[in-house]
Amino acid sequence: MSKLGKFFKGTRSSRARAAPSAQEALARLRETEEMLAKKQEYLENRIQRELALAKKHGSQNKRAALQALKRKKRFEKQLTQVDGTLSTIEFQREALENSHTNTEVLRNMGFAAKAMKAVHDNMDLNKIDDLMQDITEQQDIAQEISEAFSQRVQFADGFDEAELLAELEELEQEELNKKMTSLELPNVPSSSLPAQPSRKASMPSSVHRSRAASSRRAEEDDDFKQLAAWAT
C-alpha cells in the first residue's frame, strides 16, 4: 500500500473514532465559505486590474498587454474553480443543516413519545370506560330531574275535570236565566181602546194613535235588541 493510501486510511480511521459533532462541522464549513468568498473577491479584483493593464498597454506595449491578458485568464480559471468549490461547500452545509434539523426533530419526537407513553402507562382503559358510563348515567339523571321540575305539578284530588266543567256550565246558565228574568219588559196599556168615531171626525185621532203605536213598537224593538245582545 502506498504512503498516500496509508495516510488517507489513517485519517478515515481517526475520524471514525472521533466523529465531530454537527455544530462543529457546520462551523468549519461556514469558515470555509467565508475564506472562499474572500478568495472570490480577490480574484475578481485581480481580473479587473489585469484587464485595465491590458487596455492601457494595448497600443503602446503589446507584450505587456499580452502578459496582462494571460494573468487575467489564469485568475479567471482560478475563480471558476473557487466558484465550483464554494457551491459544493454550500451544498454540503445545507445538507448537514437539514440532517441536523432532522436529527433534532427525531430526538424531540422520541422524547415526546416517551412522555406520552409514561402518561398512558398510568391510564387504564377499563377505568376510562367505567368513568364514561358514570358520567352518562349522571347526565341522564340530571335530565330526568330537569324534566320533572319543568312539568306541571298535579295533585291526586280524585275529582273529574269533565264533571267540574259541566257543573260550571250549569252555574253559568242559571246565572244567565236569572238575568233574563230580572230584565224589565215594557208595560202594556190596560185600558180599553176608545170607541171608533165617525169616519169624518176621527181622522186626527186615528193619526195620533198610529203614531203612539209606532213609538211603542220601536221601544219594544229596542228592548228586545238589548235583551238579545245581553244574551249573546
Curated annotation (Swiss-Prot):
Region described as Intramolecular interaction with N-terminus: spans on this chain: 154-232
Coiled coil in keyword set: yes
Positions of the UniProt region annotated as Intramolecular interaction with C-terminus: 1-153
Protein localization: Cytoplasm, Cytosol; Late endosome membrane; Midbody, Midbody ring
Molecular function as annotated in GO: protein homodimerization activity
Any one GO BP annotation for this protein: autophagosome maturation
Coiled coil: 21-45, 125-185
Phosphoserine PTM sites in chain numbering: S210
Stretch list, region Disordered: 1-23, 177-232
Modification comment: Phosphorylated at Ser-210 by AURKB during cytokinesis: together with ZFYVE19/ANCHR, phosphorylated CHMP4C retains abscission-competent VPS4 (VPS4A and/or VPS4B) at the midbody ring until abscission checkpoint signaling is terminated at late cytokinesis.
Pfam families (UniProt xref): Snf7
Cellular component per GO, a single term: multivesicular body membrane
Keywords (A to Z) from UniProt: Coiled coil, Cytoplasm, Endosome, Membrane, Phosphoprotein, Protein transport, Transport
Membrane topology: Peripheral membrane protein
Subunit structure of this chain's protein: Probable core component of the endosomal sorting required for transport complex III (ESCRT-III). ESCRT-III components are thought to multimerize to form a flat lattice on the perimeter membrane of the endosome. Several assembly forms of ESCRT-III may exist that interact and act sequentially. Self-associates. Interacts with CHMP2A. Interacts with CHMP4A. Interacts with CHMP4B. Interacts with CHMP6. Interacts with VPS4A. Interacts with PDCD6IP; the interaction is direct.
Family in the record: Belongs to the SNF7 family.
PANTHER family listed in its UniProt record: CHARGED MULTIVESICULAR BODY PROTEIN, CHARGED MULTIVESICULAR BODY PROTEIN 4C
Biological function: Probable core component of the endosomal sorting required for transport complex III (ESCRT-III) which is involved in multivesicular bodies (MVBs) formation and sorting of endosomal cargo proteins into MVBs. MVBs contain intraluminal vesicles (ILVs) that are generated by invagination and scission from the limiting membrane of the endosome and mostly are delivered to lysosomes enabling degradation of membrane proteins, such as stimulated growth factor receptors, lysosomal enzymes and lipids. The MVB pathway appears to require the sequential function of ESCRT-O, -I,-II and -III complexes.
Domain notes: The acidic C-terminus and the basic N-terminus are thought to render the protein in a closed, soluble and inactive conformation through an autoinhibitory intramolecular interaction. The open and active conformation, which enables membrane binding and oligomerization, is achieved by interaction with other cellular binding partners, probably including other ESCRT components.
Protein name: Charged multivesicular body protein 4c
